[in-house]
Amino acid sequence: MAGGSPAAKRVVVYRNGDPFFPGSQLVVTQRRFPTMEAFLCEVTSAVQAPLAVRALYTPCHGHPVTNLADLKNRGQYVAAGFERFHKLHYLPHRGKDPGGKSCRLQGPPVTRHLCDGAIGRQLPAGAPSYIHVFRNGDLVSPPFSLKLSQAASQDWETVLKLLTEKVKLQSGAVCKLCTLEGLPLSAGKELVTGHYYVAVGEDEFKDLPYLELLVPSPSLPRGCWQPPGSKSRPHRQGAQGHRAQVTQPSPKEPDRIKPSAFYARPQQTIQPRSKLPTLSFPSGVIGVYGAPHRRKETAGALEVADDEDTQTEEPLDQRAAQIVEEALSLENQPGAGAAISASAPALPS
């Protein structure tokens, strides 16, 4: 790490009130967590707390930790929300219990980490360890597995030599081995079997999404990265199955449900508007167009009744039909017959 910058700290966080939670290991750096609030948000995801983590306590005495500077390297803490601290035996036991089952060893336990690629496993003494190594700055080549014996893990120069032969970096020999967060390792005892690391040469560590792009999701433990769109596939299949069920009419109601290409909702029948109720007026009221009182101008005036000489004009369609006798009136006039016979042409004999 560059001089002057604060060193990274490894802490283990337990879940408040859960004695069976194995703990989650986190790497705390000033660059990754500039504030205490950012660190508490990461702790919430790491311990899978049902509510947001708002406080950290020491597991033995329950003293609150309010500043990142108060965190100690390889320290152990309990994450809690707004509830009170539950004093339980969070730290792992040493040795074996009376039932014969092995218990966790004292010290920072190796547990699942959201940024790591696998779950650390404690192997028997003398058993070889397996680690997965990425190439620094290479987002094309998948990680390779490296088997380290117990003797090789104790010599760090031997580990770097094996990495140089296996990795074959373009920059040359492997100078250091870093975690996915960029924290360089200096001894083989810091390696955890099953975890992912980055081999770095003479250049600087490149913080890239190695795990998200180069590791398939089935090989990752639960809670790690998943490729985008994988969660939506079952939903899409379920939606298609639901559509198929909707389009197929049920045998009980073959006439009511009809298949539709657009899966539209059935339209409701528009009910006709009811007729307006007939207005009923109280006695003495003519209607809405009739004035309740007589006007002052017409006070004392009498209504003129119609007589036989009153002429009225009726519409044509309402008049009574009349017979017009024009031919009879011409015959009754004197000299009309002679005029008619003179105007008629003479017929040939």
From Swiss-Prot:
Family annotation (SMART domains): DCX (SM00537)
Region (Disordered): 222-258, 329-349
GO cellular component: microtubule; microtubule organizing center
Gene3D superfamilies for this protein: Doublecortin domain (3.10.20.230)
Domain Doublecortin: 9-91, 129-211
GO biological process: intracellular signal transduction
InterPro entries reported for this sequence: Doublecortin_dom, Doublecortin_dom_sf
Protein name, UniProt field: Doublecortin domain-containing protein 2B
The organism of origin for this protein: Homo sapiens (Human)
Encoding gene (name): DCDC2B
